[in-house]
Amino acid sequence: IDWHGHQDRGFGVQNSLWALEAGAHRVHACAIGIGERVGNTPMDQLLVNLQLLGWIDRDLTKLHEYCELASRATGVPIPDNYPIVGRDAFRTGTGVHAAAIIKARKKGDDWLADRVYSGVPASMVGRKQIIEVGPMSGISNVQCWLDNHGIPVRPELVDAIFQRAKESDRILNDEEILSLVHGLTPTAAAR
């Protein structure tokens, strides 16, 4: 028995799981759900759910690369907010989320850090949790960003970046933050 589902009502993955539960031998799916009308069952989402349910045990760390390849080959873009392989799938600029991830990392608990605010562990699909700085960020976001970029965490630098983030209506990009860093970092000639 084969099952072939579409995304007309957004239930491709759920219906595929139910089909397998009911005894289907095979379910059809496509990378990033590419298919007629609104698409077929998204293979990437199906595989991740099968893995998380313990129904399969596969190395999914190249799934993102595969979906990027499918996107380029077909000309179908991956939306930024697409689950698992979208640009924003593992990004957060929210203070409470970042604080929990950072706290787990500081305790050496990478397993928890990868799951505390994500229903899918980023490492399972070859990705990483990314902490950004924006208007909903906390001080810990700024400290983490500086640390991740090898920049010493100094109070005046943290305060300046944090203030700029709070005045913004969006996530700050790396260039904006680096500009603030360079503006507040003494040059070698001034020392």
Model-derived features with residue positions:
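A mid-to-C-terminal "edge-of-domain" accessory segment
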Residues: 56-191
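Conserved, mostly hydrophobic/aromatic
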Residues: 23, 46, 146
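Glycine-rich phosphate-binding active-site loops on the catalytic face of alpha/beta enzymes
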Residues: 22-39
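Catalytic cores of alpha/beta
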Residues: 9-22, 41
